[in-house]
Amino acid sequence: MDIDQYMTDLGRRARHASRAMARASTAAKNAALDAVARAIERDAQALKDANARDVARAREKGLDAAFIDRLTLSDKALNTMVEGLRQVASLADPIGEIGNLKFRPSGIQVGQMRVPLGVIGIIYESRPNVTIDAAALCLKSGNATILRGGSEALESNAALAKLIGEGLEAAGLPQDAVQVVATADRAAVGKLITMTEYVDVIVPRGGKSLIERLINEARVPMIKHLDGICHVYVDDRADLAKALTVCDNAKTHRYGTCNTMETLLVASGIAAKLLPPLGKLYRDKQVELRVDAAARAVLADAGVGPLVDVTEEDWHTEYLAPVLAIKVVDGLDAAIEHINHYGSHHTDAIVTEDHDRAMRFLREVDSASVMVNASTRFADGFEFGLGAEIGISNDKLHARGPVGLEGLTSLKYVVLGHGEGRQ
């Protein structure tokens, strides 16, 4: 297979399909989503059979249990796909909305209309559910998409792509609006991220090595985040019960997510009250504690251990594991300085009962999501009321934070006149 020619053809077809998608009615898009949902229900066994072949090959390669779990399409996973499709269909269609409409002294009206981005390339690892999630959001937002999943999920993705194509055709929409790259060749990714004439934006969903490669090689703009080094700062005016709940949930709810707390900052004035019960809670949940000298003194005195001395590298590390770095700081200024220096601009939280300090934290912490008295785990499209998300961005341009339907659109100015000319 000539990868360059193959990818160029996918891009050309996607660009052509994107024009039809931009003018597609809400009813047609919802009909396509419903048709795909019904097709998954109908062909559930065939999908599981295709997935079983992918899983068998992954086991032969010796891939670990966590990877196999992400790859596997269980009945529950298929039901979640179906529910997700119907949920996206139920969301308000942002395309064509005109907002900020204002009358000008010249007599014209000026507003902004929400429109699709065009063609979106999605690059992800071996999670077949992303094929459906990404296709649904791109379809509802009026975009065409090229999906490049992990090589270990080729058969699963091909089977899902067939059903997506059926759904598009049943709704009178172009099948090329959702295309799945049918090769495991890594050169396909290299071509996709440089096809500026056909692809408007890339959304990568994967590990740090994938994102770093794309940052270095992509010519197409990206919506992405590299790390999720999330912090919780417990102020000396915090409610202790709230602090314990937030710190527990932010770290132990799920270890392997990008919105999990990796560094805990504790004001020196509350460290003696907070750290002993919190340290025991983490110890009972087998969380490794990497601590500075001040935190060690408090925790050791309370009989909490074992403790590991924190290093400079720890402040830069996204563990994605039951490991937590802890630092005692002088107060709010030091906490904000630490977060803005070491953080990844993803999600950070403060626990405090002081309104002025909370507002300062919200204003001054340079992150996509900033929270007061709430767990960092809430940084999620569903929890934010977006209905669904295609990913999280910690960049500052275009989309920032959880990216839902509106994040896959842009605004263009529209002018309504009555024959006016500029004086």
From Swiss-Prot:
Transmembrane segments: none
Pathway connected to this protein: Amino-acid biosynthesis; L-proline biosynthesis; L-glutamate 5-semialdehyde from L-glutamate: step 2/2
Family membership noted in the UniProt record: Belongs to the gamma-glutamyl phosphate reductase family.
Protein name: Gamma-glutamyl phosphate reductase
Compartment(s) of residence: Cytoplasm
EC primary class: oxidoreductase
Keywords, comma-separated and alphabetical: Amino-acid biosynthesis, Cytoplasm, NADP, Oxidoreductase, Proline biosynthesis
Summary of the function given for this chain in its UniProt record: Catalyzes the NADPH-dependent reduction of L-glutamate 5-phosphate into L-glutamate 5-semialdehyde and phosphate. The product spontaneously undergoes cyclization to form 1-pyrroline-5-carboxylate.
Any one Gene Ontology cellular component term annotated for this protein: cytoplasm
Record PANTHER family: DELTA-1-PYRROLINE-5-CARBOXYLATE SYNTHASE, GLUTAMATE SEMIALDEHYDE DEHYDROGENASE
Gene3D superfamilies tied to this protein: Aldehyde Dehydrogenase, Chain A, domain 1, Aldehyde Dehydrogenase, Chain A, domain 2
EC number: 1.2.1.41
Matches recorded under SUPFAM superfamilies: ALDH-like
PROSITE patterns: PROA (PS01223)
Principal location listed in the UniProt entry: cytoplasm
UniProt-listed HAMAP family: ProA
Reaction equations catalysed: L-glutamate 5-semialdehyde + phosphate + NADP(+) = L-glutamyl 5-phosphate + NADPH + H(+)
Alphabetical list of Pfam families matching this protein: Aldedh
One Gene Ontology biological process: L-proline biosynthetic process
Provenance organism: Burkholderia cenocepacia (strain HI2424)
Gene Ontology molecular function terms on file: glutamate-5-semialdehyde dehydrogenase activity; NADP binding
